[in-house]
Amino acid sequence: MSQNGDDMNKAMMVDGNAAGGMLYDVFSAEMTASPTECAHCGRHEQIGELLAFVHAPGIILRCPACENVLMRVVKTGEFTYVDARGAVYLRIAK
């Protein structure tokens, strides 16, 4: 991707709090304060501190340190797909 494309993508990212509503719908819990760990660089963050790309069919959450994709969430008419393979763990409160 070109430098201009990278800059535009970064300009469209917001903090992970923007994903809070969709994550609540998926997990039935407040997720923005939930801790996670990046599988690439090992950084520990709360979901609300991640970078969120919300201008897509779903959301993409990235590590603010290395920009590794920690989680993708896509809702379709029938299903919700969650891919969290970029996270070592995601802790969900009871």
What label would you give each PLM region?
Residues 15-28, 43-49:
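Short Cys/His-rich Zn2+-coordinating modules
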Residues 2-3:
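Long C-terminal interaction/binding lobes of large macromolecular proteins
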Residues 67-81, 92-93:
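Short metal-binding segments enriched for Cys and/or His
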